[in-house]
Each structure stands twice: as C-alpha cells, then as structure tokens.
Amino acid sequence: MYPAHLLVLVAVCVSLLGAANIPPQPLNLIQFKNMIQCAGTRPWTAYVNYGCYCGKGGSGTPVDELDRCCYTHDNCYNEAEKIPGCNPNIKTYSYTCTEPNLTCTDTADTCARFLCDCDRTAAICFASAPYNSNNVMISSSTNCQ
C-alpha cells in the first residue's frame, strides 16, 4: 500500500471515530422544533434558554407566560413517562401542519398521541405568548427560586 493511501485511510478512520461520539438529536425533538416553526413566527432557537423552564431541566417559578408554556410542556412530558413504554425523547408521532394549524393524527389514547398533544399545545402556547428578550439566558440561581 502506498504511504498516501495509508494516510487517507487513517484520516477516514479518525473522522469516523470522532463522528461516532456525536450523539444524534432525538427524533421527537426534531418534530417539536418543526411544530414550533409551523405554529409561530419566532425561530425555535428563541426558546432554547428562555426563562427558568425553556431548555433542559427547570426549577423555581416560571418568570412569565412563555416560561409557563415550557413549564407546562415539561409537566406534560413527565406525565407521558408514566405511560408504560412511553419515552418522550425518542417516541415519534404523526401530525400535519398547515401553517399555523397543527393536527395530531395518531390514534387517541396512545403514547404517540399524548406526546403530539404535549408538543402541539406548547407550540401554540409559544406562538401566542409575549416574548421578553430580558428573560433569555437568565441566571437560574438568581431568577428561578
């Protein structure tokens, strides 16, 4: 084998090893992102670190109406986890989007439908709630008591 071929082979292997350490984004999160974009005018990234509950985790009292949307969504996912075999992070669902209308199409009383309803309700709530840029990236230790 030529030295140049060996270098290319090593480079490809190293690249693949690096890519293997990047976790895939949960499919449900992608669906939720698409619902947010369907229902509203703000990009989904506007909600990533908003208030005390928009984003990963949450604590304290929601700072405003929009943060309450995230609080309610978190609680909805907590309820979904009580359904046997229902994992909000990986379970996908079916819905239609005719901007700004969202319709969940899975059979009622299933995990998929429950999760879709959680995401649909949150996306509609986000679209109607006022957005206060002062509540982005707030200190949870100071503002989320």
UniProtKB/Swiss-Prot annotation:
Pfam families: Phospholip_A2_1. Disulfide bonds join C38-C97, C52-C144, C54-C70, C69-C125, C76-C118, C86-C111, C104-C116. Its cofactor is Ca(2+). Ca(2+) binds at Y53, G55, G57, D74. Keywords: Blood coagulation cascade inhibiting toxin, Calcium, Disulfide bond, Hemostasis impairing toxin, Hydrolase, Lipid degradation, Lipid metabolism, Metal-binding, Neurotoxin, Presynaptic neurotoxin, Secreted, Signal, Toxin. GO terms for biological process: arachidonate secretion; lipid catabolic process; phospholipid metabolic process. The active site is at H73, D119. Its EC number is 3.1.1.4. Residues 1-19 form the signal peptide. Binds 1 Ca(2+) ion. Residues 20-27 form a propeptide. Expressed by the venom gland. Belongs to the phospholipase A2 family. Group I subfamily. D49 sub-subfamily. Monomer. PANTHER family: PHOSPHOLIPASE A2, PHOSPHOLIPASE A2 FAMILY MEMBER. Snake venom phospholipase A2 (PLA2) that shows anticoagulant and neurotoxic activities. PLA2 catalyzes the calcium-dependent hydrolysis of the 2-acyl groups in 3-sn-phosphoglycerides. This is Basic phospholipase A2 KPA2.
